[in-house]
Amino acid sequence: MRTVSDYFGSLVFDDRVMRAKLPSDVYASLKRTIDEGASLDTHVADAVATAMRDWAVEHGATHFTHWFQPLTGVTAEKHDGFIAPSPDGGVIMEFSGKELIQGEPDASSFPSGGLRATFEARGYTAWDPTSYAFIKGHTLCIPTAFCSYSGEALDKKTPLLRSMQALNKQALRVLKLFGNEDVKCVRPCVGPEQEYFLIDKAMYEKRKDLVFCGRTLFGAKPPKGQELDDHYFGAIKPRVEAYMEDLNTELWKLGILAKTEHNEVAPSQHELAPIFSVANIATDHNQLTMEIMQKVASRHDLVCLLAEKPFAGVNGSGKHNNWYLATDTGVNLFKPGETPYENAQFLLFLCAAVQAVDNYQNLLRLSVATAGNDHRLGANEAPPAVISIFLGDELTAVLDAIETDTPYSGTEKTVLKLGVHVLPKFTRDTTDRNRTSPFAFTGNKFEFRMVGSSDSIACANIMLNAAMAETLKEFSDRLEGVSDFESALHDLIKETIKAHKRIIFNGNGYDDAWIKEATEKRGLLNLRTTPDALATVLEKKNVEMLTSLKIFSEAEIRSRYEICLENYCKTVNIEGLTMVDMARKEILPAVEAYLGDLSGTVAAKTAAVPGLACKYEKDLISKLSKLADEISDAASSLDTTLIRLKAIPDVTDAAYVIRDVVLQKMAELRVVCDEAESITADKYWPFPTYGDLLFGVR
């Protein structure tokens, strides 16, 4: 029987394969490129390409693709065969260094946000050697960046790599001040916890909203939801367990460190969490994970829903972005050590994170802004739209002591005794967890909990890296060259705490009183919707920071603003059109059919027994008739609004109409349709109900 270690990474051209397949000088040169960013010589690229091709062909590959992440939010690929004609009329397998390093896909059909006209079709893909190539099916996939003919980034990987480069530069400056001359590189490491729903494929195919939108737009509340908390960490059902086993195997073959799996809070909701990896690799792996989750689900006659809010009335899905900074010498810069009060380097990086989040709240919020995530944030199941940091009692007390120049006595670790002799004693952590916080310190990392389940983690990590890099730059500028480093460091930490402690909140983020305190007393931002959040990227401070660090150009910032707003508008427009279609073609005919049979029942009963009241049937007929009229009116009103929306030329104006008008009309249509569902006999309802969907996988 094969063990996981026998096949883990078997479809990845990783360091083990490179060491075995490449000449020693070529391997050493490529490692310098990967580890230090050194340029790659042509002869090295040719040698790597040959070895990569031979290895891929051995594993059954016939094609290669430059695998990239355009601004659509999903991955893209164009497959080219290895074959080339030979003089004898046959074919040989070829793959050159040039084909490895650079590709030229048509860029005209990808979102550009005005960076290029449709007729300007040329785009380039460039190999990212820090992310290993892998085989998917019969295709060698080469992770790449994607840019326009004139050099603007048209993808999510390029600015992520730029942000990592900026963060590395500034973090090294700070570490040198503490005498860390041996550190050559600082990298952000990420572990995204992926939540998802699994539903029966046959039921999925009967619902237009799921097929077109990935989430339900109608659905009356079933008798049972998540009230009993019996699904969270519950026994995994056989069909789901078989899916998870298959999924793990596929992910492990691709070198993805899938580690933890469990049932989540809502019925049919689950989670998959990997071990941490460097941010750009974690981003690639998460994109692959989402793709494979959906493919594997289909093999099991299931559908994997990645939408943030696929069902009303139960928890939605997020993607907790666990983030820390690590040196190439193996040090986690967010690890407090045994005595955080005395760990000056840790305290400086901690304060940098606090200042970064406070100064750039809006960038963090907009990094997770989508139409789907708007339904989740602030809904007492996910963090509120107000950004705050949870540090826990011990670290907060440490910072308070520094701010007030008072002694800190420390928090002793206590042993928990459960009162049963056979059970082990264990040490209690000095910090609890706060599941309501958007940005929580959890012992040696920060957990950014606002990312949507279907979203790429690239944008969130770009903004985290950028804000941190800018803050570390400010700290380095102040500390470099000072005559008394310890005194200057103490003053900087103290001033940072005093200036930015408003962002620290260890309480209940779901409490309405907190939102009031945050906005009215602390002056924190409450950007509740995507249009509100996206607009802040154009603020002068944000543009200057992102451009000065060379993460984005001004044109790239503007383009992303346009693309994200367009995506918001198109997403909601599709949902609105789907609601109108379902209401008119499915829900109203079902209600009318039931009304017809009810009327026939009344006629038959009164004919058989003249004078019968038939109160139940007549009351139901009256209610359903009224609801049918209201459904028709609400569908027409929404349809008219969507038609008018098409005539609005400016995407910003359209987004605000959607926020203020369209979403309200969609909600009004849903209310009456859901009410009709609740009093219509099951056999008449035209598609599976919430009860069917949420409890249909056994």
Predicted stretch roles:
Residues 1-14, 33-35, 223-232:
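Gly-rich Lys/Arg/Thr-decorated short loops/hinges at beta-loop-alpha junctions or inter-strand turns
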Residues 44-48, 68-70, 98-99, 146, ...:
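Active-site-proximal loop/turn and secondary-structure-junction residues that shape catalytic pockets
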Residues 1-27, 41, 122-142, 442, ...:
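Catalytic pocket of metal/acid-base enzymes, prominently hydrolases
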Residues 493, 498-698:
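C-terminal amphipathic alpha-helical interaction region
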Residues 73-89, 105-108, 207, 214-216, ...:
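Short linear, low-complexity motifs centered on an aromatic residue
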Residues 8-120:
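Active-site core of metal-dependent hydrolases
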Residues 44, 68, 96, 274-276, ...:
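Active-site proximal loops enriched in glycine and acidic residues that flank catalytic Cys/His/Asp
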Residues 121-306, 315-318, 325-562:
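Glycine-rich, acidic/polar active-site loops that bind/position phosphate-bearing ligands
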